[in-house]
């Protein structure tokens, strides 16, 4: 299904929303968009100097005036006029910059609703921009990514996608696929004449080139995911090793419950912190031990599941443990079970161990891992730990200026499906299969690529994407 086949609940119906964060501020913005919003605005807006209507004003112009509810003045505002199709939504738009108190902002919004607008749904302004052809779906998602970016790398990647860098790459792929599909379709049209418009060797070379390009984008997802979501970092270890204390210390706040009772953390807790421009997504997991209760058993199962997905595992052990050999065995087994993850052993409660240096050397020798000594309680060694964490993942979060990255799981899965379809087409050609089967796989690859930019889309996907936006975006 193409975007033109989809429809808004009421196409072009005027919508209104607050476009700035809720709270007290110097200024706030209330925006309206849709058919007839300039006339709607003229019913409540009066210029302070001069005359003339907003409906008669040129686009990209600002007008100082007052908003009135009947004869009662609501606020002094600046009205910015945008004319279709040169607006964010490609519709008529007005943005009122008013004073930023919550009461006055609420009054301005209510004024718009009382005069014919309805409250916008989450992401509806951006959704209209997409459906009206102002931006593609990938660019729409990039707007949300830029708003929520927490690091410079995430911001730069979102800006790159918003500019259309990835869209251009995908557009080139799609054009090549369309050409290949067109030649195959011609053969089907002239099947009775046994005409071959392109040799199978040439078609094979084209598909191999296309698949290589698709696979390069797939390979960028590991990097792109880290840039967008942060380095997935799991804090693992035995119960009461100090995992929750370490989480709180790294975050600089109390997020996890700290208790001397083993097994306090039954499920995992996730929080993020940024060190040296790299975002780490920390997961405090349930302690690894023989579970006594069903709920604890489930927590440990989830802990191991999170470790399987981790980019970095911090194994925390208590230097005062009486079962050091068991800990060393656990570390060796975990490291062997997760070869793709970076691994760091963290020796906790440094302040309580009389022979800490000797113990740390023994742990390093017994596990073959790098060991950092800390006291999660008083903060000793935490800066060193952060530095080592950054060093371990610096290559994962190194963004080159010219990079085009895939950051979304949705895009990644669509590309994987496209790559599989192209591989199927290559195998069909190699086995001299029917042209209809080859054409089917090429069309499938074309649809998968189109799903990313919105050339092929369905309502459920759009709802999933735009429901993540705030009301005013």
Swiss-Prot record:
GO molecular function: GTP binding; GTPase activity; identical protein binding; metal ion binding
One Pfam family recorded for the sequence: MnmE_helical
Cofactor(s) of this protein: K(+)
Chain's role: Exhibits a very high intrinsic GTPase hydrolysis rate. Involved in the addition of a carboxymethylaminomethyl (cmnm) group at the wobble position (U34) of certain tRNAs, forming tRNA-cmnm(5)s(2)U34.
GO biological process: tRNA methylation; tRNA wobble uridine modification
Sequence ranges assigned to domain TrmE-type G in this UniProt record: 230-394
UniProt KW Isomerase keyword: no
Name listed for the protein in its UniProt record: tRNA modification GTPase MnmE
Enzyme Commission number, as recorded: 3.6.-.-
Binding site for GTP: 240-245, 259-265, 284-287
Binding residue positions for Mg(2+): 244, 265
Binding residues for (6S)-5-formyl-5,6,7,8-tetrahydrofolate: 31, 95, 134, 473
Chief localisation class: cytoplasm
UniProt keyword annotations, A-Z: Cytoplasm, GTP-binding, Hydrolase, Magnesium, Metal-binding, Nucleotide-binding, Potassium, tRNA processing
HAMAP family assigned: GTPase_MnmE
Membership in a protein family: Belongs to the TRAFAC class TrmE-Era-EngA-EngB-Septin-like GTPase superfamily. TrmE GTPase family.
Comment on bound cofactor: Binds 1 potassium ion per subunit.
SUBUNIT field: Homodimer. Heterotetramer of two MnmE and two MnmG subunits.
